Amino acid sequence: AAPSGKASESIKVDGKVGEASKTTFEKPLEIKTLERTVLFEGDGKPINGDSLVSYALRAFNAETGVELGTVGYGDGLLLPSQIKPESPLGQVLGCATVGSRLVATFPSNAEAPGEVYIMDVLDTVPTAAWGEKQSPVDGMPTVTLDDKGMPSVKMPGGDAPTSIEISVLKKGDGQKVEAGDTTLLQYYGADWATGESFDSSWSRGAPYSN
């Protein structure tokens, strides 16, 4: 995680975690490097390199104080993001706990001025299906899951189906997906003839959103 520093520690923030904050800071704010300060430490699950994190944020121009945007609160929920330690998001949220509020200061570059982010860690999301296991269907591929939920597939042999066939391996109890919804999903595609995977969100390192 990025270190705390003079710039991030100078930001004043009022409001509850999970609600858009009131933020004040000296303008223009001098930011020399990426910094983060934990304003409030939540008592939830800690974030690690495998976590899918639901979060909300407010962003400001560090030179003028103008608000750049507020997302993730109320109706403007963001899709969860996978935390990679080497990414800017990972450097800000890494090792934080659910329920925490952090402030991050980003230095300017050739394309943009410095920025100030107030970020709330709302929750972590499972990285694989967690629903109730269903009985296998005869004639369908056999799917085995490892301890992280990543599948391996054994084909049943014989000719491939001539039309789409679907069997449910785990049945969830969450909200029903409706037309127009945006979803976040893991997938694993395998060749019927060889059983070898030709594409997978696990091999890509992040879920697919659509």
Set out the residue ranges of the language-model regions.
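Cross-family detector of peptidyl-prolyl cis-trans isomerase
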Residues: A1-N210
